[in-house]
Amino acid sequence: MTVTIRPAHEGDLPALLGLYAELHPSDPAPDPHTALETWRAIETQAGRTVLVAESRGLVVGTVDCTTLPNLTRGTRPFMLVENVVVLAAHRRSGVGRALLEAAHTLARQTRCYKMQLLSRSSRKAAHAFYESLGFRTIAQGYRLYLD
């Protein structure tokens, strides 16, 4: 399967929402107006790049990359990687690898000293995948949900 990785654009919004519904099936679907406003805020946020994987004209995966300025590590930024998702029918075909390799390239281009991602502790297959790409479990993560 041939996959093209590219920055997402507004026209990808329906496909992105479909991917996110696979990632978090219990989340309510956002209303179209709010989704569009949110996308436009994401699109204009400094340091933010949402990448999509496209195959045969279909968006089959995505990753959300945010490069954050940093006053430590010689002022080198770091990249926060979020919302890594590939359509179920396209998993284990190299799409996720291509997305994270593109994120890695972007991190290097922006001088990041690290890429950081969190994954629910129950997602063992995802953990094995991330480790196959060089990610290591070296810290304990915490979340505080606000609602």
Regions found by a protein language model. Name each.
Residues R97, Q109, S121-A139, L144:
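Conserved active-site alpha-helix within GNAT-family acetyltransferase domains
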Residues T4-L16:
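A short beta-loop-alpha structural element at the N-terminal edge
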Residues L17-A41:
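Conserved GNAT-fold acetyl-CoA-binding loop/helix
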Residues N70-V81, R91, I138:
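A conserved beta-turn-beta hairpin within the catalytic core of GNAT-like acetyltransferases
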Residues V86, R92-T105, S132:
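Conserved acetyl-CoA-binding loop-helix of GNAT-fold acetyltransferases
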